[in-house]
A protein has these predicted regions:
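C-terminal motif of bacterial Sec signal peptides marking the signal peptidase cleavage site
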Residues: 44-46
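Hydrophobic alpha-helical
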Residues: 115-134, 200, 213, 217-280
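Hydrophobic alpha-helical segments within soluble ligand-binding/sensing domains
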Residues: 58, 101, 156-181, 223-225, ...
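Bacterial signal peptide processing site
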Residues: 48-50
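An alpha-beta-alpha
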Residues: 62, 66, 77, 165-208, ...
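Extracytoplasmic "Venus flytrap"
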Residues: 59-80, 84, 89-103, 107, ...
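Short beta-strand elements at the ligand-binding edges of bilobed clamshell
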Residues: 91-93, 147-170, 183-187, 214, ...
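Flexible loop/hinge segments that line or gate small-molecule binding clefts
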Residues: 123-162, 173, 180, 274-283
Length: 296
């Protein structure tokens, strides 16, 4: 599933006057959009107006790092940045706390980073500080989860509605009449969770016989496990759709513990398809399918 790429920077290749090099248009860089967005935004062709090499500092505000998908994102970014001697990445981990993330973003603003990348914990609380960065003249990239403003430079993220739609179309092939679906949500206040839900239910809209149950796992495996233990009548569940693979794996563990035979037969799907987590879980049968959410 391709990334969605929105950017207000338009036009064909730009010429950097000091060194005479062209910066190619963004659509040529879809394989690794994160770093190449930064390179374009700060005209990273290895020079300043004096023609001397300048060190570029990228500030990254992550809402959390304790997650296989985000670990993969960070790893991809570090690998790509290692190709450039003049790029440094400063990574901040908000540990799923809005106030911590706000303070960390303001710290990056004070450091006058060349580019600021924000992956918000929740949209509304982070909106104002994202606007602060943008108004301070720092190119500000929002990734994964959206903010409630247009005061940012660009947004990079997966098409979460299409991910949900694909998951729903997959589910439609396996749902018996009058099936009961358990949906394990990410954080309900975040755009990926809302869009993955909407795509999923839209794909199944014609199936008026279906029923849905919902628990909020908040993207976290431990929270998903805790909420699963509160589930009433697990024997009624015919299908499980989790908003990420780690919560899907937690669901498999729960249902096997409840009934080893039925728990293994129950069809469970997730999202992310990250190497070392979801992909291996599909291969070894812990989950039945995983839908790709690109890390950028």
């Amino acid at each position: 599933m391709p990334s969605v790429w929105h950017c207000r920077a338009t036009g064909m290749a730009r010429l950097c006057q000091p060194c005479g090099k062209y910066v190619r248009p963004l659509f040529l860089y879809m394989k690794h959009p994160f770093l190449l967005v930064w390179l374009t935004l700060i005209v990273l062709c290895g020079c300043t107006s004096s023609g001397k090499q300048k060190r570029h500092v990228i500030g990254l505000s992550q809402c959390m790092l304790d997650d296989a998908w985000r670990e993969a994102m960070i790893n991809d970014m570090r690998i790509e940045a290692s190709n450039y001697d003049d790029v440094e990445i400063i990574i901040k981990d908000a540990q799923n706390n809005n106030e911590t993330q706000i303070q960390q973003i303001r710290d990056l603003i004070r450091q006058k980073v060349d580019v600021l990348i924000i992956s918000p914990y929740q949209s509304e609380p982070i909106t104002a500080v994202a606007e602060e960065a943008y108004r301070a003249g720092i190119p500000t990239i929002i990734t994964d989860r959206k903010v409630n403003t247009d005061q940012y430079t660009s947004f990079v993220g997966a098409n979460n509605y299409e991910i949900g739609l694909a998951a729903g179309n997959y589910a439609a092939h396996y749902l018996p009449p009058n099936a009961i679906i358990l949906e394990i949500w990410g954080l309900t206040q975040t755009s990926p969770a809302q869009e993955r839900h909407k795509g999923f239910v839209d794909a199944l809209r014609e199936r008026e016989d279906l029923s849905f149950r919902k628990i909020e796992g908040q993207w976290l495996v431990d929270t998903a496990r805790m909420e699963l233990r509160k589930l009433e009548h697990p024997e009624q569940i015919d299908f499980v759709y989790a908003h990420n693979d780690m919560m899907a794996i937690a669901a498999r563990e729960y249902f096997i513990a409840w009934d080893s035979i039925r728990g293994r037969d129950l069809r469970i799907i997730g999202v992310d398809a990250v190497a070392g987590a979801g992909l291996e879980a599909v291969e070894d049968g812990r989950i039945n399918a995983s839908f790709l959410s690109p890390t950028g």
